[in-house]
């Protein structure tokens, strides 16, 4: 199968490892390389692409700023180094993107933020708003609070979770290697680069090495795990070398890399997950006008809800039924059961008054809603 073209993707997550961002000898940012990457991002941004960056480097920068000795760090030392490094990392990205007139917004997340549905929706909403404003979200694992038991591993899997959370079309993992090989190339001179992976089989997993460095906690194995997460969520993924300047431009020009392809798209995969994998915690009954609106692809507004049943939290799955009690669809609700009861049947301006905050307009956003064909559900 032919490789896709980079410029054909609408929303792209770019993951930058600490071994690329930080010079391991000097402990400082590789400024010229980062400026070249920022120029690549700006070029895609100027073409209308939406870009997100998942950036490692806070611990590496922190240990440099604090002049810590080389060698492994204890957990509390890593957390303290990250606290210093996060400030430097945010400033660096703000400056290099700002040189191109692009705003940057820092988001620090943990494993729970992408696995617990309420926090997942909060992070997703923040990312969506930054993209609406044409800013670039710069995301990092919150190393100051993450522990060994709740880590990802060099942000590869975090990047994959972010990509699926943001419904990205493509995840680019920039690495110190230009893709997946049939064997570790440093050990086997006959190792071949695999340009396209259509399915992650046991053989593909066996090809993953375990190389890592003091500055980078991950290896090829975590990249394969990331590919599983991304492709299951409907996001294509590629691994490419970030050791060259302008790495995204190199990919766009047909440079060496490995593509992991998925037959799904992010919206389809997400809606399949909502419809088939989540246990509903409650029910929203809606009026006939809302049924018509949902079948036309609209979001569910509080004004169309006539009854709320069950005890659910924000982000839980609920069943949506029409006035005849037949199931219309399922979705992730944006309010908990108590607030949903208070605002049912009310207009958007009323919702802000009732709740005392300017909340979300939708009871269920259309991206979080799966509607079945007329008469097919319930």
Swiss-Prot record:
Gene Ontology BP, a term: L-proline biosynthetic process
Name of one Pfam family that matches: PUA
Gene Ontology CC: cytosol
Positions of ATP binding: 15, 175-176
Pathway given in the UniProt record: Amino-acid biosynthesis; L-proline biosynthesis; L-glutamate 5-semialdehyde from L-glutamate: step 1/2
UniProt entry tagged with the keyword Kinase: yes
UniProt: substrate binding residues: 56, 143, 155
Gene3D superfamilies linked: Acetylglutamate kinase-like, PUA domain
Main location as per UniProt: cytoplasm
Domain of life: Bacteria
Entry EC number(s): 2.7.2.11
Family membership: Belongs to the glutamate 5-kinase family.
Function as written in the Swiss-Prot or TrEMBL entry: Catalyzes the transfer of a phosphate group to glutamate to form L-glutamate 5-phosphate.
PANTHER family: GLUTAMATE 5-KINASE, ISOPENTENYL PHOSPHATE KINASE
Protein name: Glutamate 5-kinase
Classification of source organism: Bacteria, Pseudomonadati, Pseudomonadota, Alphaproteobacteria, Hyphomicrobiales
